Amino acid sequence: MGKEQELLEAARTGHLPAVEKLLSGKRLSSGFGGGGGGSGSGGGSGGGGLGSSSHPLSSLLSMWRGPNVNCVDSTGYTPLHHAALNGHRDVVEVLLRNDALTNVADSKGCYPLHLAAWKGDAQIVRLLIQQGPSHTRVNEQNALEIRELKKYGPFDPYINAKNNDNETALHCAAQYGHTEVVKALLEELTDPTMRNNKFETPLDLAALYGRLEVVKLLLGAHPNLLSCSTRKHTPLHLAARNGHKAVVQVLLDAGMDSNYQTEMGSALHEAALFGKTDVVQILLAAGIDVNIKDNRGLTALDTVRDLPSQKSQQIAALIEDHMTGKRSVKEVDRTSTAQLPLLSNTDAIAPMSQGSMEKTVTELILHFDTHADEEGPYEALYNAVSCHSLDSTASGRSSDRDSMNKEAEATGTRAAGVRPRERPPPPAKPPPDEEEEERVDKKYFPLAASEGLAVRPRIQSSAPQEEEEHPYELLLTAETKKLGTTDGRTEDHRQSGSGRSQDSVEGQDGQVPEQFSGLLHGSSPVCEVGQDPFQLLTAPSQSHPESSQQDACHEASMQLEEPGVQGTEPPQPGVPDQSKRVGLPAGLTALASRTYLDALTHTVPLRPAGAEEEDQSGPRSRAPPTSKPKAELKLSRSLSKSDSDLLTCSPTEDATMGSRSESLSNCSIGKKRLEKSPSFASEWDEIEKIMSSIGEGIDFSQEQQKISGSRTLEQSVGEWLESIGLQQYESKLLLNGFDDVRFLGSNVMEEQDLREIGISDPQHRRKLLQAARSLPKVKALGYDGVSPTSVPSWLDSLGLQDYVHSFLSSGYSSIDTVKNLWELELVNVLKVHLLGHRKRIIASLADRPYEEPPQKPPRFSQLRCQDLISQTSSPLSQNDSCTGRSADLLLPSADTSRRRHDSLPDPGTASRADRFRVQEEPSETKLTLRPPSLAAPYAPVQSWQHQPEKLIFESCGYEANYLGSMLIKDLRGTESTQDACAKMRKSTEHMKKIPTIILSITYKGVKFIDASNKNVIAEHEIRNISCAAQDPEDLCTFAYITKDLQTSHHYCHVFSTVDVNLTYEIILTLGQAFEVAYQLALQAQKSRTMAASAASMIETKSSKPVPKPRVGMRKSALEPPDSDQEAPSHASVSWIVDPKPDSKRSLSTN
């Protein structure tokens, strides 16, 4: 395979000399063996000398014959695939001369012709069609045979193939506007009526993406294409939906029926719904029937009449005027561009019923989602990291791997098996179309018409599957060659398809509601909403004007541009129309009254300081008024004229900031500057009174918030996420323990948590956290003076009933013990592995009255570990049975000292116990391990890899491949491990995928953790592991033997890593775990012996000097010598061994 790999690489990189050299030997051997000729004309299959001759000499020649010209890599690419994709014409010619087959499909069913057409290389396309030894069937589709496709007729729906898109080369060329390739394919009598899996013809794709020249070519060659429409769509509908007015005009001039009706209605429905005013005018001028209804019984006018954007009202006026003939188009344009008066009174919204508006828009969204599978044929082209998304993804940015990965994460998809730094260049830029020059004002539409396609979206959950099925996905693995000058100037040929430019991303996140993002996929929506959906349409409460000002009048009052106009002045004629920003219908605007604007000057702003910058980059969803505590509300407010004078902020500065509010920092700076003069004391007192009165109003609104908040808490996490437009993260939150809306408050869910669970988009994280602030915080334990009566009732209040058994079995049976919990214990002792559940518990214990844990290392004698031989067969998750605790680190210092005091009840001996403890501490501050050379004489190293504390209080994790396990019938130490390694290596040679696990090693044992989902698979206690060794034949492979306590059988578990050094470190860490466990056992025995000695002393006369203990104990155990003498004793085992059998009982580790 070495030569074939070289050939594949040379073809991919365009190394012509290397290709010729590798194939030169093949031509010689082919001619000598009697195979096909050098030009490849002799073999019917183009195989040449590839085993076609039955001469015995051919088998001998195979040993030195050149590489197979049709060899394939893991993606199914032949050298011809690589050369065609990357535009290496000379290499293609050489491969064709050497009998390269042109009709070999890759793993996604693509021929080299598909790749060349997608790339837009007309010369290579002609080469593949005309010069190949086997004439490429130009009409060949990715998977289904032609006879199957033609069985039901070329224009009827047919069977969808699951592993391809059923696209011809003409589809690929038409979609990207490769005019020359389309010409070449049409010259070969390519059938342009074929449809892909989503029933789209090449003409549909060209109309969808605005490829004007391709549309003209296809219509000129096959005028009958205009009659090949389906109930799903027509070219006219697709072009109208995306505002390609030139394409619309060409289709109408060619005779396409403008009144053709699909499930979504007429082309006028499409253009009106997606705000394409120019297309609406063209269709009206062409005499389209405005009374056509869609499948919901709505006309185009009904669809846009109630949508609250100026663009929709403009289109509605166009249609109405066309029906009545009252005004001309120019008059409508002049009317639409006239500025509307400033909307200040939100009572004007009242005639617009929230229920009717919400119902209308929701029905549109639900209808699109219902037909998502049929209507979203190119969803994978926008979301998946595939061949079609290689074109810089409509951003104009450098198309490196980082930007692509970021783009894939934003859509929730990522291509599997993508090699780093390998990416083919995008196809050559198609000729600019007339439609691409059209731009829509982004003030009203976040996505320009040419930057966003209104392709019907799939539901989010289907995106990964679609990506997996896309036949061009693996093109990412095709090339390492970097883009040259195209990187800086490449524009996506589907720029209107992805709509992911930086500007449009900001606009989309900041202005378009998430419910519409799935509807449009980049097309400019008519319903322009500045923040959370339908929030702007809510009728204000008369008793609480603050809530209504949040979305309507607050921004309007903050945008006064005249320097001399203060908050108490009525709006001037020069003030820009703010109703456009809040997305209200033009007919609902009203003149602002002086009284209402007066009230604005005393309104607490519902947007914190710095929100202006935030609006430019992220979602503008703001918390409801009562989500802030009163004290916080006092820090951010709008200022009246007198207040702004007090703070010496000029009106010009206010206008340039675009807001009448002042941040806390600005207020505090002004206050410090003014407080130097006593004359301002009365003014500041007045300000405080104003702020206090504002707080009272907020208190009233909090009662109302409780009612609406209770409804929110009854939602599921999925419903809550859907309400904020981030339902794609439901699985991430649920799988990580954020599974209850009642416990998603700001003291539970933090930005670091969202980053850890895989939410990489900072704007989405910000929006989640903003929504979480409106949820109630988890109440601290005993916040109301009444603590739960039991641990089960406390866990039940947190919705964590599943952990009751774990808490009780681990010794946490009372609320007092729970108050001392730390996260370390939650993970290692109580096995609360879900992050959201741990954060929920910690938030409940936030205000517990205890001291901080000690910073110095704990005393290991307090571990009170049992002898290894006396351990039960309980799993590693069981806590130490002596105290229910694992270390002093987990105990408050007061509780630790109290426990020591209780163990020595005689006051007369307390001082002696203290003296012994003080003497003991210097030698116990650090556990001393024997070096590897003493612990295991065969070990060639002199030091361990980790500190002992790492294996006691934490764990050492290593990623490895698990090859399998084998029953050991005759235990022979390392010989058994070698036999098992050899057998497992052989059995896994043909496995396509070897499972990856994480070995988590502690002094207690080894855990198997699934690397994909972090679930614990199995646990092996350290006392049951008898031998661990590397495989001498493959040093990346290692194994260890365990004993099954139930059956008494021994099993050898075999693993492999990618690095020899890593394997050696794992073996050494296992050995250190043995040593740590052994030394802790010695420490435990020493502690028990000392306790027995102290007890015997208490039984004697407490007033007399301490006698020498009567047990066979060395004096150093009772009165430890200096630390320099104690350290060697830790390194040796003999210092604690005593001839008496009692002292030997717990030292066996076999």
Curated annotation (Swiss-Prot):
Pfam families: Ank_2 (PF12796), PID (PF00640), SAM_1 (PF00536). GO terms for cellular component: cytoplasm; neuron projection. Residues 33-53, 391-583, 602-666, 872-927, 1096-1150 are annotated as: Disordered. Residues 33-51 have a biased composition (Gly residues). It comes from the Eukaryota. Its main location: cytoplasm. This is Ankyrin repeat and SAM domain-containing protein 1A. It comes from Mus musculus (Mouse).
